[in-house]
Amino acid sequence: MKYIFYLLILFSTLSNSQKFDERVDNLIQENIEETIELRHWFHQNAELSNREFKTAERIAAELRKIGYNPKTGVAKTGVVAILNEGKEGPVVGLRADIDGLPVKERANIPWASKMTGIYNGEEVPVMHACGHDMHTAILLSTAKILYEIKDEIPGQVKFIFQPAEEGAPAGEDGGAELMVR
């Protein structure tokens, strides 16, 4: 997780001072437990493509708590927030996929998914089987950390929480293509 945050600042003209590095390291350490808690919540509450309603609500609520004004309903259930909106300079987009898969949870963990959803007309178990829960939690933590140092970022950062990355249900549009329309 630490390396994601360092990659984010490569685009900027920020000082590489030891003091700045220590500040970022401290912010990361301060947010690790919350990131894990968020990941567990998203894992327990996995939703299928274009049905990520609770997921989107939680993402938007977390972003508002930080200080963002997120746009919801993007590409049906996507969420977008912008750091330093309107600020001159480079613009960087960071994306996390938020949908789960029609897969039964087999792990015996306290945060196992017990969610179900309708897939091809049948009720099926749903879980995050390929890391979208982690992607979402890490991007939220990244948004929080960058918000803390926003005055030192010489441009904008767009946080994109994309629904339906695994593919929209039959007969529906969804995913990245809708996000950029």
PLM features: residue spans?
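Positively charged n-region of N-terminal signal peptides that target proteins for export
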Residues: 1-4
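Fold-level recognition of mixed alpha/beta catalytic cores in primary-metabolism enzymes, strongest
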Residues: 153-181
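Acidic/His- and Gly-rich active-site-bordering loop/insert found
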Residues: 19-128, 137-158
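N-terminal signal peptide c-region/cleavage motif recognized by signal peptidases
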Residues: 10-14
